[in-house]
Amino acid sequence: SEHIDPERAKGNIYWDCFHGFRSALAPPDPDDLATTFSDVERQFYETHYTAFIENQNERNAKIRHTERNRSIPDLLSSRKTCPEETIYQLGTLDEHASAEDLLSVVTEFIEKFKAKYGEHIHVLDWALHLDESTPHIHERHVFDCENKYGEVAPQQEKALEALGFDLPDPDKPLSRRNNRKITFDAACRKML
């Protein structure tokens, strides 16, 4: 893309839940990193959600609704079950924190985040981008909890409920404008 500086891209830093920290210099081909992040997310989903998928597909077959069957790629691409991305940036385009300060603040925040919410929210990967106008971090996580069958499944609202988050307006029904994600996002901003 036009806004990416290939020389500065060499300073990008990457982390994922299976391999830990990496840099753009290893592996030397930056395209491998995108594939690797996709692979990391697929591997996490296969490890954690295959039993749910297989059992749900069996239940669908028993009631003759195999058209409802899903696969790991379906979970990864569905708006309701795919990893969620958060972008962290300190400051503006003209006045922003250094990459070192951003990395320090966000890694400390992610550690607190995992300690507090890690039972139901899993940080899969993140990337510190130095190759654009301002340093920023793309972080991806997934929400999950046990369903009524005792299977761990990706489900944001139920995971947040299990973590004790309330609706912003408990007197109103769950809706697009009244959901636990709103309360969770506010708690994360306060924690950061």
Region annotations inferred by a language model:
Residues 1-192:
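N-terminal nicking endonuclease/strand-transfer module with a His-rich metal-binding environment
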